[in-house]
Amino acid sequence: MTPPASPSPGIRFENIDKRYGGLYALRQVSLEISAGECVALAGRNGSGKTTLLRIAARLVRPSAGSLTFPSTHQSGEPGRLQSGFVAHATMVYDELTAEENLTLFARLQGTTDVQTRVDTLLRDVGLSDRRSSLVRTFSRGMRQRVAIARALLQEPSVLLLDEPATGLDPHGASWLAGTLRRLCDAGCTILMSVHGESEISSLATRGIRLDTGRVVADTKAGASLQSILTFADA
């Protein structure tokens, strides 16, 4: 797996609010994710995990507060930080092949030496022999591999994942855990939402629990961290 192209920046959320009409999805969220940390977001459905990830990915704007990347002195403006986002619903095109999906997004993102990068990623995610297969014929786990390869096209310093293990069989979950472990070892900053304790969540060195849009727990300690992950949906 190719390591990040540059030292991975941390992420700082300062007093983040997100409203949809009169409903708060996030309220007064202040967090700092250190460079190279692997952080798990836990909580019930609707607790704000996906909204926080989408703000970090700059797909939505907060209603109040700020998002910054302090270790590189970059603001949260689009295009100023290489980050990859893997959504809960895999964002790939069913009627294209695995190779065509990656080639399309590589060109849209301005990737240099597109064919070499696509070849490398197909090999890294174990899909070289299925490069010419239509994605609609893939299992959930194989689709997830395409989505992760897409997120890694720009060699991101930050990887954001929304429930990446959902629907994966044990083999797919084991592959994903190994991939994320290699990225962590290479210095990539990872922020991911999880449901309960799993091989994926066990990679986390820090756990943050959200409830009704607020941070209610944040720990790196062993027993406390496992408690957050084990009872993520309680």
What are these model-derived regions, one by one?
Residues E155:
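Conserved catalytic motifs of ABC-family nucleotide-binding domains
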Residues L159-D162:
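Catalytic Walker B motif of ABC-type/P-loop ATPase nucleotide-binding domains
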Residues A42-R44:
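The feature captures the beta-strand-to-loop junction immediately N-terminal to the Walker
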Residues A57:
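Helix-to-loop junction immediately C-terminal to a conserved catalytic motif
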Residues T103, R107, D113-R130:
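Conserved ABC ATPase "signature" region
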Residues S193-H195:
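H-loop/switch region of ABC-family ATPase nucleotide-binding domains
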